């Protein structure tokens, strides 16, 4: 059985000059000292000390071997998203990031699955960048869970998600730029409290806005960190949908009806929490995620899954790798759309598109 980790990060060795591509939008770059100590930088400011696996593929592969991980999906670090930049500059930045991620993963192409990033602040550009990245070899796309005040149920962003469904590109959604940060000034509370709330907000937004009704069911979508607080609070949302018309106004079905529209990773760090998550999502909707190589990640890859009560060997195998292999499996090539016949009913009525092909 191949163990597959769907949630890991990379930060290529961008120079200070390269980081200036995102002037006034974070300017991310990586400083590596003479002794090998790494520091993620935002302009001139130190952001976070980091370990070598974040930029050194040899170190990552050694850590994977030590942890029994066969394959990792490799995605950018959220500091690199660039959503605050002008869209054209952000697209150039994403092309550079995506090229560097491909270079990084080329050290072990059978073990490292590259995930691209896109300028999500401009959904049309995001579609173009995602299409280029997929053609270049990226196996999925990594996005933040919002762009400013635009959440995943924003019409433009749902259009991007629909595009990913049409081209068969899996989507990994990661919380970032956490709400309420002004009230969470210490103890990493934005990561401990804000991130789970962000993900819960994104999932419920897609459900209650009716967005899942508009996005093709073929979309492969995964939320990090076990879907945040969603599983624990599903009952609250379900009760509200049944009892308040303002909750169900835009959603024809209750929240529980959309559970089969997305996956979550296993990064909840407690077998009891994972058991609840599996009970809510089902064994085929949960995949191993470690958050490698950050300090808040799972140090024993798959340890929580192995310790989770009530799983048989087959179910553990699904969580440890089987589900991820299916999630990231290359989409079958789409058959060419038939050319519609033109007759007196269609001539002069404007363009004729195959299903799903309208711009």
List PLM regions with ranges:
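Divalent metal-dependent hydrolysis catalytic cores, especially in the metallo-beta-lactamase
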Residues: 41-52, 61-85, 111-119, 139-143
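Surface-exposed, active-site-proximal loop segments in enzymatic domains
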Residues: 77-93, 124, 186-189
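Short acidic/His/Gly/Ser-rich catalytic and metal-binding motifs that mark active-site loops
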Residues: 81-83, 126, 179-186, 296-298
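Short glycine-enriched loops at secondary-structure junctions
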Residues: 120, 175-179, 292-294
């Amino acid at each position: 059985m191949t163990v597959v980790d769907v949630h890991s990060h990379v930060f290529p060795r961008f120079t200070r000059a390269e980081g200036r591509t995102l002037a006034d939008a974070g300017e991310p770059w990586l400083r590596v000292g003479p002794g090998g100590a790494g520091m993620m930088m935002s302009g001139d400011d130190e952001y976070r000390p980091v370990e070598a696996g974040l930029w050194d593929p040899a170190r990552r592969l050694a850590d994977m071997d030590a942890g029994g991980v066969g394959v990792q999906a490799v995605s950018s670090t959220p500091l690199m998203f660039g959503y605050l930049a002008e869209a054209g500059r952000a697209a150039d930045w994403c092309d550079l990031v995506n090229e560097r991620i491909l270079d990084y993963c080329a050290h072990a192409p059978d073990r490292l699955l590259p995930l691209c990033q896109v300028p999500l602040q401009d959904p049309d550009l995001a579609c173009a960048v995602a299409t280029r990245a997929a053609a270049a070899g990226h196996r999925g796309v990594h996005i933040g869970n919002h762009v400013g005040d635009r959440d995943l149920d924003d019409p433009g962003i749902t259009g991007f998600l629909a595009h990913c469904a049409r081209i068969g590109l899996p989507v990994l959604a990661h919380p970032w730029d956490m709400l309420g940060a002004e009230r969470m000034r210490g103890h990493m509370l934005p990561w401990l409290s804000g991130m789970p709330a962000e993900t819960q907000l994104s999932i419920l937004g897609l459900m209650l806005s009716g967005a899942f009704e508009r996005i093709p069911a073929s979309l492969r979508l995964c939320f990090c960190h076990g879907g945040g607080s969603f599983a624990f609070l599903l009952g609250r949302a379900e009760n509200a949908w049944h009892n308040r018309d303002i909750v169900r106004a835009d959603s024809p079905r209750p929240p529980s009806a959309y559970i089969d529209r997305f996956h979550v990773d296993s990064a909840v760090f407690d077998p009891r929490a994972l058991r609840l998550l599996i009970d809510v999502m089902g064994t085929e909707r949960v995949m191993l995620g470690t958050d490698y190589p950050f300090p808040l990640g799972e140090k024993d890859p798959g340890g929580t899954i192995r310790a989770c009560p009530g799983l048989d060997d087959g179910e553990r195998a699904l969580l440890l790798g089987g589900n991820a292999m299916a999630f990231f499996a290359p989409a079958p090539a789409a058959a060419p759309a038939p050319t519609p016949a033109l007759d007196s009913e269609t001539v002069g009525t404007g363009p004729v598109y195959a299903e799903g092909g309208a711009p």
